[in-house]
Amino acid sequence: MAIGEQQVIVIGAGVSGLTSAICLAEAGWPVRVWAAALPQQTTSAVAGAVWGPRPKEPVAKVRGWIEQSLHVFRDLAKDPATGVRMTPALSVGDRIETGAMPPGLELIPDVRPADPADVPGGFRAGFHATLPMIDMPQYLDCLTQRLAATGCEIETRPLRSLAEAAEAAPIVINCAGLGARELAGDATVWPRFGQHVVLTNPGLEQLFIERTGGSEWICYFAHPQRVVCGGISIPGRWDPTPEPEITERILQRCRRIQPRLAEAAVIETITGLRPDRPSVRVEAEPIGRALCIHNYGHGGDGVTLSWGCAREVVNLVGGG
């Protein structure tokens, strides 16, 4: 299709929708964003967040997408206003102890085994690396401003079906996240409830992640003004109401690993529903006379996959 001749509607204003809209608009496509929720009200806004590779289908494509995203985040980290910082990280956990290191870590030049003295009690091994950490409220504002600079505005417009957008534009990008379950009729999309506790930062500069196959783990993301602590994942739970018992467990675990967090005051408890799916879906599908490009099913890896998947969207639109 000829760039500039076809109107594009992007559905969704989370990190996937904004990034896709930016890539399309900066490539010359006229873009509109329709969203049920504005960026700061999306699940993306309550993410930790860090670029961190994890096993995910389709493996070969995901490997390329996370690598593309890493390159972009490294560039963004050169400007503090983006909310992206290259941050020292310590990761520990049973997946490391068994040697099953996450694919993609070879992309990090300074990844190295942690000295046993650096590994908290209860864990046998870990690794150090410098990873892109993203302060999501600040980052979403940055993306929104970058999108606005292209002349694109975000319209609050909930949809009942993709056909509504297909009637308004010949190209539709479905970045609806969990909403894709209804909009795309995809019963394989399910929520995974997550809860974070946000604390004041007592002077921490490192992020910590426990890698485990369990439903609860230890993590904290030390942003300049706050520390986001987690984590938990409850599959199939639709209720976003925070639970005080979960808050207490998160605080106890994180303060055991990092005693300085005992000095920090609780600012708020935040929750979100991660849009889980057996595999990430980035592919084209005709809807009536329109071309629909799906970009959803990222689960808890929306940030890590965002730029790679968005560039794939641009390629699919251009090849449509």
UniProtKB/Swiss-Prot annotation:
Belongs to the DAMOX/DASOX family. It is found in: Cytoplasm; Secreted, Cell wall. It is an enzyme of class 1 (oxidoreductase). GO terms for molecular function: D-amino-acid oxidase activity; FAD binding. It catalyses: a D-alpha-amino acid + O2 + H2O = a 2-oxocarboxylate + H2O2 + NH4(+). This is D-amino-acid oxidase. Its cofactor is FAD. InterPro entries: DAO, FAD-dep_OxRdtase. One of its GO terms (biological process) is glycine catabolic process. GO terms for cellular component: cytoplasm; extracellular region; peptidoglycan-based cell wall. D-proline binds at Y220, R274, G300. Keywords: Cell wall, Cytoplasm, FAD, Flavoprotein, Oxidoreductase, Secreted. The lineage of its organism: Bacteria, Bacillati, Actinomycetota, Actinomycetes, Mycobacteriales. D-serine binds at Y220, R274, G300. The keyword Flavoprotein applies. The gene is dao. Transmembrane segments: none annotated. Gene3D superfamilies: D-Amino Acid Oxidase, subunit A, domain 2 (3.30.9.10), NAD(P)-binding Rossmann-like Domain (3.40.50.720). Catalyzes the oxidative deamination of D-amino acids with broad substrate specificity. Enables the organism to utilize D-amino acids as a source of nutrients. Enables the organism to utilize glycine as a carbon source. It comes from Mycobacterium tuberculosis (strain ATCC 25177 / H37Ra).
